[in-house]
């Protein structure tokens, strides 16, 4: 009986470290190396397909190559929703395997706050970088983003929950992830940029369900 209780305690402790719901305010996920394994799996509050969304987060990286920032895959479609940084000042959004790319001014080796919105009825895509809107584009008008998803940080999924490549991995710090099933107003996006998010209902950095896989650590955020 004592051995059984000890085993249950160890198993519970390991499970709680790997899969957690945590308030990560003023903290970051650190992805300290290139790899084809290190990632964080997110478990969203999402049971139905998406007609609209807003997704915001902060990154701090010295990578100059392309990298995956947010990978949302469903069975049969690896790039159902993907935010991909092509290079400094250039981002792509994939919806249902199709993509659009936006470009703007961005300072290298500085923290970045990124918000992306998409509205199905119009197809309009907006990128806000450090509180400033970039040129609007259109993508997949009247499309519906499928669910349930596999959501991964740190890697780009080439199949549902896997298919990672070192050359697409994110290296750096990741923080303040929030997601809504509607398009935020410009004023609300500025609130998010200033660290005052407005009731996120899909992903909430201050009550995040996540599972760490590989070499990813949590540290205080020491930059703004």
Curated annotation (Swiss-Prot):
Annotated Ca(2+) 2 binding sites: 156, 158, 168
Extent of the signal sequence: 1-20
Disulfide bonds: 56-115
Cofactor: how bound: Binds 2 calcium ions per subunit.
GO molecular function, one term: calcium ion binding
Pfam family, one: Pentaxin
Binding site for Ca(2+) 1: 78-79, 156-158
Subcellular location, principal: secreted
Pathological association: SAP is a precursor of amyloid component P which is found in basement membrane and associated with amyloid deposits.
Protein name in the entry: Serum amyloid P-component
Species this chain originates from: Mus musculus (Mouse)
């Amino acid at each position: 009986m004592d051995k059984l209780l000890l085993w249950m305690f160890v198993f519970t402790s390991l499970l709680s470290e790997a899969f957690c719901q945590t308030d990560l305010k003023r903290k970051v996920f650190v992805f300290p190396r290139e790899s084809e394994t290190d990632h964080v799996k997110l478990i969203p509050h999402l049971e139905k397909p998406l007609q609209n969304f807003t997704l915001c987060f902060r990154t701090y990286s010295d990578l100059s190559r392309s990298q995956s920032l947010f990978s949302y895959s469903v069975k049969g479609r690896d790039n159902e929703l993907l935010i991909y940084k092509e290079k400094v000042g250039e981002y792509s959004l994939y919806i249902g395997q199709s993509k659009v790319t936006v470009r703007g001014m961005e300072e290298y080796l500085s923290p970045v706050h990124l918000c992306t919105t998409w509205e199905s009825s119009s197809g309009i895509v907006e990128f806000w970088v450090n509180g400033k809107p970039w040129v609007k584009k259109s993508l997949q008008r009247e499309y519906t983003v499928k669910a349930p998803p596999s959501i991964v940080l740190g890697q780009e999924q080439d199949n549902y929950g896997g298919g990672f490549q070192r050359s697409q991995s994110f290296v750096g710090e990741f923080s303040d992830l929030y997601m809504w099933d509607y398009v935020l107003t410009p004023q609300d996006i500025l609130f998010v940029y200033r660290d005052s998010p407005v009731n996120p209902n899909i992903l909430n950095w201050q009550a995040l369900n996540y599972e760490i896989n590989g070499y990813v650590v949590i540290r205080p955020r020491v930059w703004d």
